[in-house]
A protein has these predicted regions:
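Membrane-interacting alpha-helical segments
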Residues: 6, 85-86, 156
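Generic structural hydrophobic/aromatic packing signal, biased to beta-strands
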Residues: 13, 49-51, 70, 147, ...
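Thiamine diphosphate
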Residues: 141-199
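Residue-identity detector for threonine
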Residues: 2, 42, 125-128, 158-160, ...
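A short alpha-helix capping/helix-coil boundary motif
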Residues: 2-3, 16-17, 112-115, 147
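Cofactor-binding active-site loop characterized by glycine-rich and histidine/acidic residues
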Residues: 14, 21-141, 165
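Cofactor-/ligand-binding subdomain signature composed of acidic, glycine-rich
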Residues: 1-25
Length: 199
């Protein structure tokens, strides 16, 4: 998909959400389309993708038909989109996919398969203990996995750097075999689309 198509998809979901037609949380992307498209240039059909509750772009770029993604979102499953036939999983639990992604990478390594795991996590999740353990374990065992830290500076409604009282995040600027980082600004709040009140 193109940058314009990704943006149009999210804008459509935002409009439907603000009309009150989606009775569940949504977490929208904006401003990181070029970075996301760049990451997916290296992701192959046989590779696995794990993400958090914000995963619309990943699903679309992994090849899931946009009609199917939209259908799942309208059914209230935006924060837990899973399409095993396309090898993509997401979870609404903070850090929930990290140990699963590491386990998948270990399975690939032990079976000698020609595939790799790509795990997306936000800037706040990247500061948690499970993230540090998952990344260190993967490095130590040279697992076929790559972590992508997406920094939108949001820890729900508080700036991540303020929450942790640190001007620079642990993986800020990282770019190596196991982890990459990018920062972007979004026009959407942490959850929802900025009009309808959501709890």
């Amino acid at each position: 998909m193109t940058k314009e198509e990704l943006i149009a998809f999210e804008e459509d979901i935002a409009a439907v959400f603000n009309e009150g037609k989606i009775r569940a949380p949504v977490h929208l992307y904006f401003g990181n389309e070029e970075e996301m498209i760049g990451v997916f240039r290296t992701i192959r059909p046989q590779d696995w993708v794990f993400c958090s509750w914000r995963s619309h772009y990943q699903c679309l770029l992994k090849g899931v038909p946009k009609e199917l993604v939209r259908e799942e979102i309208l059914a209230g499953r935006s924060i837990s989109l899973c399409f095993p036939e396309y090898r993509i999983y997401s979870s609404a639990i903070v850090g929930g996919v990290l140990p699963i992604a590491v386990g998948a990478a270990m399975s690939i390594q032990r079976r000698g398969e020609d595939s790799k795991v790509y795990c997306f996590l936000g800037d706040m999740t990247a500061e948690t203990g499970i993230a540090h353990e998952a990344i260190k374990y993967s490095r130590n065992h040279r697992l076929p996995i790559h972590f992508i830290v997406e920094d939108n500076a949001k820890s729900v409604c508080t700036d991540t750097r303020e929450v942790w009282n640190q001007p620079r995040l642990s993986f800020e600027g990282a770019d190596d075999e196991y982890i990459s980082y990018y920062r972007y600004e979004t026009k959407y709040p942490h959850a929802g689309a900025g009009v309808r009140v959501q709890f």
